[in-house]
Amino acid sequence: MSLQHEKVTIAPLVLLSALDHYERTQTKENKRCVGVILGDANSSTIRVTNSFALPFEEDEKNSDVWFLDHNYIENMNEMCKKINAKEKLIGWYHSGPKLRASDLKINELFKKYTQNNPLLLIVDVKQQGVGLPTDAYVAIEQVKDDGTSTEKTFLHLPCTIEAEEAEEIGVEHLLRDVRDQAAGGLSIRLTNQLKSLKGLQSKLKDVVEYLDKVINKELPINHTILGKLQDVFNLLPNLGTPDDDEIDVENHDRINISNNLQKALTVKTNDELMVIYISNLVRSIIAFDDLIENKIQNKKIQEQRVKDKQSKVSDDSESESGDKEATAPLIQRKNKKN
């Protein structure tokens, strides 16, 4: 691979197109759907901006048996060039949810259509958990530690979702339709926090399972992955206190510095949490005071309405009695004449 790619950005249109493709071709066997992705792969960041579906068939029992229409790929690619010449064929996608045995062979086929190493994008159309429903891979030659011949394997690339302004507006409208309008801001934040914690728990579980398989020699040692995990662990703050038997004279100064850093981090965290607590408390008191004021105002308005209604009734009764008194002498005169 002449160009070293670092990450992949995916437009929401690609996810919607892949989901629509799967829904239209869904069968009882729940076979995966395959398509082509378009975009730009001439920098360290691969940008996936568009896609189109492909006719695809495969034998579930035999991974070597599959069908892909080459003429359809070429014709659709030429049509897409006429619409947007900047979008190049950079790889392919399928509905996963995991890698298949035939993916390497299909990936080799797409090399004839791409300028660089083709990108494989897996879109999980039935994702139940939290996190992005996408995984991106590029094929590389893996060098083994035992000195044997290299073999082709997939390298995972981090993914993010990025949208243009028009796409952001469309996504906001979609979210507005599916969002529960009755839910308050606090409940939405708590729900998002819960989903984030569940996602973190799932990722940590995957890390533990991977390390267990490496220890049990079910998977080969990958120094790149272990180095990434070590970098993650190094970013975590060390808030633990050393045991008494771990303290000696040589590293006593270093432990004191570590303890000071731990204390400073703890104090700063507690101060920030205290500010958040006081702010929420003040906000709640103000809201409660506004509620009381609204209750008082509503009661005054209700009392005023009752007084107005009573005064109106009394005025009507007085006017009726005045009319009766004015008409009484006339009635008496008529009676005398008769």
UniProtKB/Swiss-Prot annotation:
Entries under Pfam families matching the protein: JAB, MitMem_reg
Entries under InterPro entries matching the protein: EIF3F/CSN6-like_C, JAMM/MPN+_dom, MPN, MPN_RPN7_8
Taxonomic lineage of the native organism: Eukaryota, Fungi, Dikarya, Ascomycota, Saccharomycotina
Protein name according to UniProt: 26S proteasome regulatory subunit RPN8
Post-translational modification summary for this protein: N-acetylated by NAT1.
Chain positions found as Phosphoserine: 314, 317, 319
Native species: Saccharomyces cerevisiae (strain ATCC 204508 / S288c) (Baker's yeast)
Chain intervals with Basic and acidic residues compositional bias: 301-326
Record flagged with keyword Ribosomal protein: no
Note: Present with 19800 molecules/cell in log phase SD medium.
Gene3D superfamilies named in the record: Cytidine Deaminase, domain 2
Residues with the Phosphothreonine modification: 327
PROSITE patterns: MPN
GO biological process, one term: ubiquitin-dependent protein catabolic process
Entry-linked CDD domains: MPN_RPN7_8 (cd08062)
Protein task: Acts as a regulatory subunit of the 26S proteasome which is involved in the ATP-dependent degradation of ubiquitinated proteins.
Residues that bear N-acetylserine: 2
Family classification: Belongs to the peptidase M67A family.
Protein keywords: Acetylation, Phosphoprotein, Proteasome
Residues covered by the MPN domain: 8-143
